[in-house]
Amino acid sequence: MRKLIIEPLTKEAFAPFGDVIETDGSDHFMINNGSTMRFHRLADVQTAQPEDKAIISIFRAEALPMPLTIGMLERHPLGSQAFVPLLGNPFLIVVAPVGDVPESEATRAFVSNGRQGVNYHRGVWHHPVLTIEKRDDFLVVDRSGEGNNCDEHYFAESQLLVLDPHPLEG
């Protein structure tokens, strides 16, 4: 099993997979008579069909036991999916490039600083939300519409990956 190296989440490193949603270094302008700073268009919601709708949900995630064997990734071929942490806690992100199936060798892991969210572009393979805390809440923006928008791929035994965030502690 290949151990995934957990990288800091940066816009540059994550660009092949989607957008990092954060205020640091982002364009902004003042609104509401100068009382509010708007960080505008941090990510685009992608949908496949004109009749699709962008929806907002909250996911309450439970921590999985670590180290974690990564045996499955999913993708959303009909729309993007964004996760923004609501409680300010760091969380883990596991992604692989767009393709017919995810390539185990191309899979990468990132850690958010708790003030960063991510927007997975259409078709990007990713692990379901991975909280480090016992329980965490995420604002989720994704697509609602006709058609199956979730494909799952299970890795063969020889392609399994392991994720161990414990080096992040301390």
UniProtKB/Swiss-Prot annotation:
Its EC number is 4.3.2.3. Pfam families: Ureidogly_lyase. The keyword Lyase applies. InterPro entries: RmlC_Cupin_sf, UAH_cupin, Ureidogly_lyase, Ureidogly_lyase_bac, Ureidoglycolate_lyase_dom_sf. GO terms for molecular function: ureidoglycolate hydrolase activity; ureidoglycolate lyase activity. The keyword Ribosomal protein does not apply. One of its GO terms (biological process) is allantoin catabolic process. It is an enzyme of class 4 (lyase). SUPFAM superfamilies: RmlC-like cupins. Pathway: Nitrogen metabolism; (S)-allantoin degradation. It catalyses: (S)-ureidoglycolate = urea + glyoxylate. Its cofactor is Ni(2+). Keywords: Lyase, Purine metabolism. Catalyzes the catabolism of the allantoin degradation intermediate (S)-ureidoglycolate, generating urea and glyoxylate. Involved in the utilization of allantoin as nitrogen source. This is Ureidoglycolate lyase.
